Amino acid sequence: MAPDPWFSTYDSTCQIAQEIAEKIQQRNQYERKGEKAPKLTVTIRALLQNLKEKIALLKDLLLRAVSTHQITQLEGDRRQNLLDDLVTRERLLLASFKNEGAEPDLIRSSLMSEEAKRGAPNPWLFEEPEETRGLGFDEIRQQQQKIIQEQDAGLDALSSIISRQKQMGQEIGNELDEQNEIIDDLANLVENTDEKLRNETRRVNMVDRKSASCGMIMVILLLLVAIVVVAVWPTN
């Protein structure tokens, strides 16, 4: 698993703060002896500037991780507390560098070592959940990655369900289209049959009229024959 860039930057920033405290102590030891240490002063200034830039980078990384939901809100609060702790240390170190604040020994003792930083619970956190209490940062990172993976798996499952439902909807739509086509064909067939029935009815009516006309003609012909017969029949 790739290391979290935020924690990698945080670790290096803590090391810079530790180094600044040690070099301020060295400089003050020289000054107590009446000696000057210009090289140490220049180094400390550069380290303080580096510390400031690292803290700004941590703020940017944290804001990006929270805004893109790469970490949970709880983890975001946890990292913000660690970041606030670093900002406080930066102010103490700057004040000590200018001989305006606490002694560097006190500052140095307040800086967590790498082992304590990874093993002891953070005193700045309140109401730490039982799931993360006593865990080191590596373990917490793994736990956060596991949570993110579970969330991704849940989203994948949800996406699969939505895709299947969409496919079912398309299949139902296709089936409805086929049913509509069948209904249209039946309607056309009924219409054609009705047209044929009307045509046949007209033909039957015409035949009936023709049959009636033929009957009348036959009657007339018979009457004419009867008249002719009567006319030519000899009478005594």
From Swiss-Prot:
The listed locations are: Membrane
Give GO MF terms, alphabetically.
Answer: chloride channel inhibitor activity; SNAP receptor activity; SNARE binding; syntaxin binding; ubiquitin protein ligase binding
Residues of the t-SNARE coiled-coil homology domain? 145-207
Q: Which UniProt keywords apply?
A: Coiled coil, Membrane, Phosphoprotein, Transmembrane, Transmembrane helix, Transport, Ubl conjugation
Coiled coil (residue ranges)? 42-65
Which tissue types show expression of this protein?
Answer: Highly expressed in heart. Also found in brain, kidney, liver, lung, placenta, skeletal muscle, spleen and pancreas.
Its domain of life reads Eukaryota
| Entries under InterPro entries matching the protein | Syntaxin, Syntaxin-8_SNARE, T_SNARE_dom
Which residue positions does Phosphoserine occur at?
S160
Q: Which cysteines are joined by disulfide bonds?
A: none
Per the UniProt topology annotation, the Cytoplasmic ranges are 1-215
The biological process GO terms on file are: cellular response to type II interferon; early endosome to late endosome transport; intracellular protein transport; regulation of protein localization to plasma membrane; vesicle docking; vesicle fusion
Q: How is it modified after translation?
A: Ubiquitinated by HECTD3.
Q: Which CDD domains match?
A: SNARE_Syntaxin8
Q: Which residues point to the Vesicular side?
A: 233-236
Gene Ontology CC terms, in alphabetical order: early endosome; endomembrane system; endoplasmic reticulum; endosome; late endosome; perinuclear region of cytoplasm; phagocytic vesicle; plasma membrane
The membrane-topology field of this record reads:
Single-pass type IV membrane protein
What PANTHER family would the database entry show? SYNTAXIN, SYNTAXIN-8
**Quaternary structure per UniProt?**
Forms a SNARE complex with STX7, VTI1B and VAMP8 which functions in the homotypic fusion of late endosomes. Part of the SNARE core complex containing STX7, VAMP8 and VTI1B. Interacts with VAMP8. Interacts with HECTD3. Interacts with TPC1.
What function does this protein fulfil?
A: Vesicle trafficking protein that functions in the early secretory pathway, possibly by mediating retrograde transport from cis-Golgi membranes to the ER.
Similarity comment: family membership: Belongs to the syntaxin family.
Provide the protein name.
Syntaxin-8
